[in-house]
Curated annotation (Swiss-Prot):
Cofactor: [4Fe-4S] cluster
Keyword terms of this UniProt record: 4Fe-4S, Cytoplasm, Iron, Iron-sulfur, Metal-binding, S-adenosyl-L-methionine, Transferase, tRNA processing
SMART domains listed in its UniProt record: Elp3
Occurrences of domain MTTase N-terminal (ranges): 2-119
Organism of origin: Coxiella burnetii (strain Dugway 5J108-111)
Lineage: Bacteria, Pseudomonadati, Pseudomonadota, Gammaproteobacteria, Legionellales
Start and end residues of each TRAM domain: 377-439
The protein's name in its UniProt record: tRNA-2-methylthio-N(6)-dimethylallyladenosine synthase
Broad class of the protein's primary localization: cytoplasm
Length: 439
């Protein structure tokens, strides 16, 4: 059996895409995943262009793969994802040993691309945007455990000034409503109990229904919650400007919708938000959270922050810190700003010194870490309903799962509990997890 070595950079959407790459090549060519590159026949790198030095990271990885191809010339190396979409033929110029370059929207064509390389021994590039075609040509989803990702839309049409996603993944396109329902139903039959709905801007979902009507994210959640085997529903990533009243109503009406929301705000300064073209103000963001907490008072809130965006002053940063205090975020993905090629913000002077960026990032992360520790400590003594996902990564003799507010809980238990919802009494708050006992 031939082997596939697959490495993924970036977000949950990329993780989902990588799983589909493995599925489609297993179905078409019988390729089995391996964690040992020395025995691999096909190498795939699924890339992310959001963070700093993304291209450098890609070519460094490819450099580590080159000796495998020199030693075994039949090896096929492919580069996919957002860097592939952004760089295209440039990848072949800088790394001529690469055989396949494909974008996020053409991963379903991997079997044909692989056949072309094998037959012609010539590199191929396909970074087109064939809309929603890829979902129609993928194999049936395979569950890897009781929790699964389901992509419900692709691309983004917000065009924030710092972001490359609209240029690398294309405009927003929603999957048909019935297709999403069918995929979730198939996963349920395989034992999945928790679904995470994915999209670059997931709450802009507008799925065409069989009767010609259009379903928004809230309606999709209502339908999924009606499935008996679904115990919990999550979604990511949301955009504040598209966070609707219907979605707030769904939190009020559907107990299966997890008591956690990731809603990236990026900055607490209206001036910086305008420069980012985020299309909301701090007051509007706060208003949506206030309405949400009126129906879910104890909901856990996480966010994204970009530190040191061009023109960010001490006052702008202080406004961000004030927002963090007011909102009580207990987790964040926070990054130092770096210009992404081809974005409007890349034309702005990157005028915040790196030392200042690093200092601000450390201050922000410390504030959020303190809040997260406080919340974790407050959970000691409470009973939490968790979905048991498998053995603990850190403590293999224990089982592990996640609370509704997305905290890892480790506990002693037997393997038949995997895939079940259990109630755990939290006994201890640890730095990156909780520990408890079955009630």
């Amino acid at each position: 059996m031939k082997k596939l070595y697959l490495k993924t950079h970036g977000c949950q959407m990329n993780e989902y895409d990588s799983a589909k790459m493995a599925d489609v090549l297993k179905f078409s060519h019988g390729l089995e995943l391996t964690e040992d590159p020395a025995v691999a026949d096909v190498f795939l790198l699924n890339t992310c262009s959001v963070r700093e030095k993304a291209q450098t990271k890609v070519f460094s990885e490819l450099g580590r793969w080159r000796p495998f191809k020199e030693k075994r010339p039949h090896v096929v190396i492919g580069v996919g994802g957002c860097v592939a979409s952004q760089e295209g033929e440039t990848i072949l110029k800088q790394a001529p040993f690469v055989d396949i370059v494909f974008g996020p929207q053409t991963l379903h064509r991997l079997p044909d691309l692989l056949d072309s390389v094998i037959q012609k021994r010539k590199s191929v590039v396909d970074i087109t945007f064939p809309e929603i075609e890829k979902f129609d040509r993928l194999p049936q989803p395979r569950a890897e455990g009781p929790s699964a990702f389901v992509s419900i839309m692709e691309g983004c049409s917000k065009y924030c000034t710092f972001c490359v996603v609209p240029y690398t993944r294309g405009e927003e396109i929603s999957r048909p409503f019935d297709d999403v329902i069918a995929e979730v139903a198939s996963l349920c039959e395989q034992g999945v109990r928790e679904i995470t709905l994915l999209g670059q801007n997931v709450n802009d979902y507008c799925g065409l229904m069989h009767d010609g009507q259009v379903a928004d994210l809230a309606l999709l959640i209502h339908y999924l919650a009606a499935m008996d085997n679904i115990e919990r529903i999550r979604f990511t990533t949301s955009h504040p400007s598209a966070f609707s009243e219907n979605l707030i109503d769904a939190y009020a009406e559907e107990p299966k919708l997890a008591n956690h929301l990731h809603l990236p705000v990026q900055s607490g300064s209206d001036r910086i938000l305008a420069a980012m073209k985020r299309n909301y103000t701090v007051l509007e963001y706060k208003s949506k959270i206030r309405k949400l907490r009126a129906v879910r008072p104890d909901i856990s809130l996480s966010s994204d922050f970009i530190i040191g965006f061009p023109g960010e002053t001490d006052a702008d940063f202080e406004a961000t810190m004030n927002l963090i205090h007011d909102m009580g975020f207990d987790h964040s993905f926070s990054f130092i700003y770096s210009p992404r090629p081809g974005t409007p913000a890349a034309q702005l002077p990157d005028d915040v010194p790196m030392a200042v960026k690093k200092e601000r990032l450390a201050i922000l992360q410390n504030r959020i870490n303190v809040k997260a520790a406080e919340i974790s400590q407050s959970m000691v003594g409470t009973q939490q309903r968790i979905l048991v996902t498998g053995p603990s990564k850190k403590y293999p003799d224990q089982l592990s799962g996640r609370t509704e507010n997305n905290r890892v809980v480790n506990f002693n238990g037997d393997t038949p509990l995997i895939g079940q919802m259990v109630t755990i009494k939290i006994k201890e708050a640890r730095p990156y997890s909780l520990w408890g006992e079955i009630c």
